[in-house]
Amino acid sequence: MPNNAQAFVNVQTTVIPKTAFTAHDFVNYTLPKDKKKQNDTENKKKQPKDGENDKQKEQAETQPFEWIQQKDADDKKESNTANTSDSLAYADFAVLELTLFLDNPVDKKVFDHFIQPAIKTYEQLGNSLKLFAKPTLTELKNHRYYLSGYPFLENKVNVLSVNQIKKDTSTETTINGQTVQQSNHEQPLIVRSTIAKPTLIRNQGDDFNGSNWVWNYDNSRVFRF
C-alpha cells in the first residue's frame, strides 16, 4: 500500500472470533429523500419564534429521522435511484469477543496496535466502570478482548487483508477449545477495493456524507505483520 493511502486492515488472528453482541440487523439503512424533506419542512414550522428559549429551539432542531431497510440488491438499486438520499447511510454496530494468544506474532501485533491503545484510551476517558482494575491488564493476556465496529458502511477505502484464511476447513485444529484458523501462505496479503466493508467511523447524523476515520493513522510509522 502507498504510504499516503488509507485502508481498513483486516487481520486473521490465531482463532476464530466470537460474536459477543450484535445489533438487531446487519443491514444498510437509508433515509428517504421525501421523508427528509418532510422532516425539514416540519422542523421549520416548529422553529420557535424570536424570544423563545434555547431549549425549545434545540428540540425543534433535533427531530428524529425514520430510516428504511434496504432488503436486497434490487430494492437497494431501485430505492437509491428513486427515493433515497445518495449521501445518507447508517449501520448498526457489533462487538466481537476475540481470544488472543500473545506468543503468536500476528496476535501480538493485534494486541499491541489495536487492543492496548483502545484500553489506554478508555482509561484516559475516565474508566468509569473500572473494567481493567480487576483483573489487571497482565492477567487478561491470552484471555478475551472486545472490539467494537460498524459492520457495513458504504465507502471507497481499500481493505488490506492480512494472514488470509484457507478455504479448505477439513483439517481443523483447536487450541484450548478454540478453533484455529488455517493460514493461506500462498496469498498472505490481499488488497481489495469494495464499497461495503467493516469500517470504524463516526456517525454524523443527517449531514453524514461519507466515512471519517476515528483514528488518523500516522503513515510515517511502519509496523509489519
Curated annotation (Swiss-Prot):
Belongs to the MG067/MG068/MG395 family. InterPro entries: Mycoplasma_peptidase_DUF31. This is Uncharacterized protein MPN_583. It comes from the Bacteria. It holds the Pfam family Mycop_pep_DUF31. Residues 32-82 are annotated as: Disordered. Residues 37-60, 69-79 have a biased composition (Basic and acidic residues).
